[in-house]
Swiss-Prot record:
This is Pantothenate synthetase. Beta-alanine binds at residue 61. It catalyses: (R)-pantoate + beta-alanine + ATP = (R)-pantothenate + AMP + diphosphate + H(+). It comes from the Bacteria. Signal peptide: none annotated. The reaction proceeds by a bi uni uni bi ping pong mechanism. Belongs to the pantothenate synthetase family. It comes from Shewanella amazonensis (strain ATCC BAA-1098 / SB2B). (R)-pantoate binds at residues 61, 155. The gene is panC. One of its GO terms (molecular function) is pantoate-beta-alanine ligase activity. Keywords: ATP-binding, Cytoplasm, Ligase, Nucleotide-binding, Pantothenate biosynthesis. Pfam families: Pantoate_ligase. One of its GO terms (biological process) is pantothenate biosynthetic process.
């Protein structure tokens, strides 16, 4: 695997592949990789001739009091994991390469509506930062397909919407959430959990499972949400939000919506954990 922070080197290699009629898959990450990221790389290998990944801790998507400085940087370990998984090209830019004029003078991308709720309401400007960096990386790499984890369900829909609205010529693939044996969704932020908190963190997925079963059995959505929130508080969480939405639009569900998604964000110790579950009723 070749690692570079130089935009022109990425473009030159991709052009060579394309000149040979070969396809390119892209997996953008913020590093500190876990099994979920490696699953994305392996799926990417099934969908294209070549796999490109990026590692960039994007300052534009972090709020003033969030964990930008504390976010783990583990480049050597990440390079080894990506190489073993079959990634061929790794882009590792610095903020001054991505945002040479600084964040305040940077052109940005905003996906209205879907970016403003749930995580967007809790983290103002977050999805502006996500959409901007993802579009910039797409312009640099020019992939045929890009892969994202379904754990970040709202992010996936924001990116799909951006790609559709801007007529970008690539496919967006959502890959199923990879979980630990307890059911906890794998996340780079799980490293913030103490051993005791990690044991209790499985209650998040359990609450989503119970809520989906209740709604499927006919329980009113509001009543099921109230019970799930109570279960999270009992387990030691501080819920940020727990909501049921249309699985396709993230709009509040109507009686006609049969495919639903429950989305949750909750604090446990220093960690803000998110998870979701798509279900039918």
């Amino acid at each position: 695997m070749y690692t570079t922070a130089v935009i022109d080197e990425i473009r030159q290699q991709v052009r060579q592949w394309r000149a040979s009629g070969e396809t390119v898959a892209f997996v953008p990450t913020m590093g500190n990789l876990h099994a979920g990221h490696i699953t994305l790389i392996k799926e990417a290998k099934q969908r294209a001739d070549h796999v490109v990944a990026s590692i960039f801790v994007n300052p534009m998507q972090f709020g003033k009091n969030e964990d930008l400085d504390a976010y783990p940087r583990t480049l050597a370990e990440d390079q080894a994991a990506l190489t073993a998984a079959g990634c061929e090209l790794l882009f590792t830019p610095t903020p001054d390469i991505i945002y040479p004029k600084g964040l305040d003078a940077q052109t940005f991308v905003e996906v209205p509506g879907i970016s403003d709720e749930l995580c967007g309401a809790s983290r103002p400007g977050h999805f502006r930062g996500v959409a901007t960096i993802v579009l910039k990386l797409f312009n640099i790499v020019q992939p045929d397909v890009a892969l994202f984890g379904r754990k970040d369900y709202q992010q996936l829909l924001v990116i799909r919407t951006m790609v559709e609205d801007l007529s970008l010529p690539l496919e967006i693939v959502g890959v199923e959430t990879v979980r630990e044996a307890s059911g906890l969704a794998m996340s780079s932020r799980n490293g913030y959990l103490t051993a005791d908190e990690k044991a209790r963190a499985a209650a998040l997925k359990a609450a989503l499972d119970a809520l989906a079963m209740q709604i499927g059995a006919g329980t009113a959505i509001d009543a099921a949400i109230t019970e799930a929130n109570a279960a999270l508080v009992t387990a030691g969480f501080r819920p940020d939000y727990l909501e049921v939405r249309s699985a396709t639009t993230l709009a509040l569900p109507t009686d006609a919506d049969k495919e639903l998604v429950v989305l949750a964000a909750a604090y446990l110790g220093k960690a803000r954990l998110i998870d979701n579950l798509v279900f039918s009723r």
